[in-house]
Amino acid sequence: MRALFVYAAAPAILLAAVATAHAAPAAELCGVLRAFVGAVQPGQVRSFAFHTSWGTNFKHAQEQALSAKRCEHGGDPAAQAVCAYLMQHGQTELADATVMDSVACLSSGTTFDSSVRLHHAELSFRHEAINAGATITVTFGEETEQGGRVFRLQVEGD
């Protein structure tokens, strides 16, 4: 019965995710990301890592799961806010959509066509915060140690 649910539910979930992928990023996501970037001071580096697994749980997890999420914030309050948002709203089935939405939030004028899929990405760009500038580095790809995929965002203040 459990396998039947997985096979019946997975296509419906995937279709719903495809329909919403690449819509305009949520204002709340943009807000927590901009607050995270704005909190960095000159010479300071902040980061978070959002781990996702679709179709199975992470490698060392005991229980079975259709999907799983984890977020590492290192105790940084601004990163904790991003992680709280991503744990509630971040996509697992199309994890690259969360990455593209985040880049679109922080890099003005950047958009992605609905046909774009990210399998591996590493990009860096400037962001001008209210009081100072920052360099943002985004990486996305396979996570060999835990399994699944990982989206990392690092901000280095000028």
Residue ranges and their predicted role:
Residues 1-4:
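Positively charged n-region of N-terminal signal peptides that target proteins for export
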Residues 7-17:
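Bacterial N-terminal signal peptides
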Residues 66-124:
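Long, charged/polar, surface-exposed segments that mediate recognition or autoinhibition
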Residues 20-79, 94:
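N-terminal leader/targeting segments
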Residues 146-158:
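Short, low-complexity, Pro/Ser/Thr/Gly-rich segments in the mature regions of secreted, periplasmic
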Residues 135-147:
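Short, exposed beta-strand-loop hairpins at the edges of beta-sheets
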Residues 87-89, 142, 155-157:
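A mature extracytoplasmic/lumenal domain signature
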Residues 125-131:
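Active-site beta-strand termini and strand-to-loop segments that position acidic
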